[in-house]
Amino acid sequence: MNAFGVDISRWNIKDNVTPDWSTIKASCNFIAIRSGVSWGYTDNWFTHNWQGAQGMCRMAYHVIYFGEDATKQMDAMFKIVPGDWKHDRLVLDLEVHGGNSKAKITSTTRDCMNIIRSRTGMYPILYSRASWVNQYLDVKGLPDADWWLAQYK
């Protein structure tokens, strides 16, 4: 299935101008909204964007730092993201290796996935680039998951 969606975070918002939600809703199948990074950063536009995208298929994505504690990072994400896990999905953004080993990256990813599963009843979607996954992650060491692979043009 081909679906078109957009990724939105404070980086996409210029001069504090609110996104045009009617245009986004008319042209997209889903929207991915950044909630934060690791355990200590909240995207300051998340709540506004999450509310603006109400009625769409929404995904909240959280950037994981592999050298940090998985529970602490997931606690931070769940403080940011309100949950309606019947319709909305959580995404782990896997793209900053930080010099960690493949084993550490895989174990932290697995731990985060299992925490999300225990709190929501489903595994998160995993977001990355295929080349990054091939270089830094042992996919066989993870539970089955849906993938969102970036394709930059």
Label every PLM stretch briefly.
Residues W11-T23, Y41-G52, E68-G83, W132-Y136:
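Alpha-helical scaffolding within the catalytic cores
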Residues V6, N16, W45, M122, ...:
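Alpha-helical structural elements
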Residues N29-D43, W50-G67, R89-V91:
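Short, well-structured secondary-structure segments
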Residues S22-N29, M74-K153:
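Surface-exposed substrate-engagement region within the catalytic domains
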Residues G5, G36, G40, G52-G55, ...:
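Residue-identity detector for glycine
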Residues D7, A60-Y61, I125-L126:
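Short catalytic-loop micro-motif centered on adjacent basic/acidic residues
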Residues R10-K14, G36-G40, I64-D69, E95-N100, ...:
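Solvent-exposed loop/turn segments at secondary-structure junctions
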Residues M1-S38:
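Boundary/entry segment of secreted carbohydrate-active catalytic domains
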